[in-house]
C-alpha cells in the first residue's frame, strides 16, 4: 500500500496538485512539510498547500487535478471526497479512526490499519508521509520532522529504534526520551504556537520547510521563528495556570473519574491543556470546554490509558446537539453550539454512568 502511494506521488505534477493538511496540529504540519519537501527534491518545485480542521475540511473548494489529504480523516466526509474524485485524482494519508475504507470507491486511501500491525492511532501522519516518501527518494535529512508527529500524537513508544537514531543524529535534542518533554516538546510547542498568529499555519509551515535541523528552530534562526517563540511564551503562561489550578476550577466527578473543565482561554491551548492534564493524571477522563465564538463551543476529550474511547465519547455526546467530533481512542475533539453546554455535560455523565454501570 505504501508503494501505491509512492507511485501516485511520482505521477503528480506540482502545478496541478494541492496538499491539504491538518492545520494547527504538529503532526499535520510536519506531514505536510515532509510531502512538500519531497516534491521539491523530486520535481524541483512544490505544489499548493492548504490547511483545514476536521470540522471544516468538507467546505474547501478544491479543483486541482490531484489532491492529497494528509492527517485528516476525510473518509468521514465520504460524499464530499467522492465528489472530488469525479474530476481529481485523490490520495488520502491518514491515521485517525477509520469510518469508511475509500479504497472500495476507487480512491487510494492509505491507513495503517489496512497494512500494518501498529495501531493507526500510534502511526502518526508524519511517519506515514515519511515512509511513503522514503520509497521515492532519499529524505533522511527530514527524519527529525517525523519526531514532531510522533511526540505530538503520542506514538513514540512504538518507534523507539527510529527515535534513538534521530536523537543520536541531532545532539541539540538532548538525551533520548519517549515522553513529551525536553527539547522535542519545546520544538513542538513553538511550531503549534502558530495558531495564535494571523496566517500562523502558513508561518509555521514556512519555518518547517526552511529549517535544516531542530536547532534552526530551537535557536531562533529567523524572524519567523522568533515570532513563533514569542507567541509560545504567552501561551505557556496561561497553560501553566490552568494545569496547576484544575482541581479548584473544574467539575470533578470522582465516581466516574471524569473531569469537565470549562475554561475561558485567551490563547488556543485547549488541546494542549487537555493533553497536559491527561498526562499528569492518566486515570482520569478529561473534557475541556472553551467557547471560541458566540456559536462555537470547542471540546477536547482525553484518556491517555484508553480506559474510555474518546472517539466514541466525542461522537456520542455531541450528536444529539447537532455537533460533530472524532479522533482517536486516547484523544478526540468536537464542536457544538454553546447553548447546549449544560445538556452536553449531562450527556457525558449519562454515557459514562452507563459504561461503568453506576
Features from the language model and the residues they span:
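Extended amphipathic secondary-structure runs
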Residues: 245-246, 261-262
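Accessory alpha-helical/coil subdomains and C-terminal extensions
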Residues: 155-244
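Coiled-coil termination/hinge junctions
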Residues: 248-254
Amino acid at each position: 500500500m505504501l508503494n501505491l502511494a509512492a507511485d501516485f506521488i511520482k505521477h503528480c505534477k506540482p502545478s496541478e496538485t494541492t496538499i491539504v493538511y491538518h492545520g494547527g496540529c504538529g503532526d499535520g504540519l510536519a506531514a505536510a512539510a515532509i510531502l512538500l519537501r519531497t516534491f521539491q527534491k523530486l520535481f524541483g518545485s512544490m505544489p499548493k498547500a492548504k490547511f483545514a480542521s476536521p470540522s471544516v475540511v468538507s467546505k474547501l473548494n478544491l479543483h486541482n487535478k490531484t489532491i492529497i489529504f494528509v492527517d485528516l480523516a476525510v473518509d468521514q466526509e465520504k460524499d464530499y471526497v467522492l465528489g472530488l474524485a469525479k474530476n481529481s485524482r485523490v490520495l488520502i494519508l491518514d491515521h485517525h479512526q477509520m469510518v469508511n475504507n475509500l479504497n472500495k470507491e476507487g480512491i487510494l486511501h492509505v491507513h495503517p490499519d489496512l497494512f500494518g500491525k501498529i495501531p493507526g492511532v500510534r502511526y502518526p501522519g508524519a511517519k506515514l508521509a515519511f515512509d511513503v516518501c522514503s520509497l521515492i527518494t532519499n529524505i533522511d535529512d527530514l527524519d527529525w520532522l517525523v519526531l514532531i508527529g510522533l511526540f505530538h500524537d503520542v506514538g513514540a513508544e512504538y518507534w523507539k529504534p527510529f527515535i534513538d537514531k534521530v536523537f543520536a543524529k541531532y545532539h541539540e535534542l538532548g538525551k533520548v526520551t519517549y515522553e513529551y518533554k525536553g527539547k522535542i516538546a519545546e520544538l513542538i510547542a513553538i511550531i503549534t504556537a502558530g495558531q495564535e498568529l494571523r496566517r500562523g499555519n502558513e508561518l509555521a509551515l514556512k519555518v518547517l520547510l526552511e529549517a535544516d535541523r531542530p536547532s534552526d528552530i530551537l535557536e531562533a534562526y529567523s524572524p519567523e521563528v522568533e515570532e513563533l517563540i514569542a507567541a509560545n511564551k504567552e501561551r505557556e503562561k496561561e497553560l501553566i495556570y490552568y494545569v496547576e489550578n484544575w482541581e479548584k476550577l473544574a467539575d470533578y466527578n470522582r465516581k466516574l473519574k471524569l473531569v469537565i473543565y470549562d475554561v475561558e482561554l485567551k490563547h488556543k491551548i485547549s488541546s494542549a491543556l487537555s493533553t497536559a492534564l491527561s498526562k499528569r493524571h492518566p486515570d482520569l477522563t478529561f473534557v475541556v470546554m472553551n467557547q471560541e465564538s458566540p456559536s462555537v463551543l470547542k471540546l477536547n476529550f482525553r484518556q491517555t490509558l484508553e480506559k474510555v474511547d474518546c472517539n466514541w465519547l466525542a461522537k456520542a455526546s455531541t450528536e444529539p446537539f447537532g455537533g460533530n467530533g472524532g479522533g482517536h481512542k486516547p484523544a478526540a475533539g468536537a464542536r457544538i453550539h454553546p447553548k447546549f453546554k449544560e445538556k452536553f455535560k449531562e450527556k457525558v455523565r449519562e454515557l459514562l454512568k452507563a459504561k461503568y454501570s453506576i
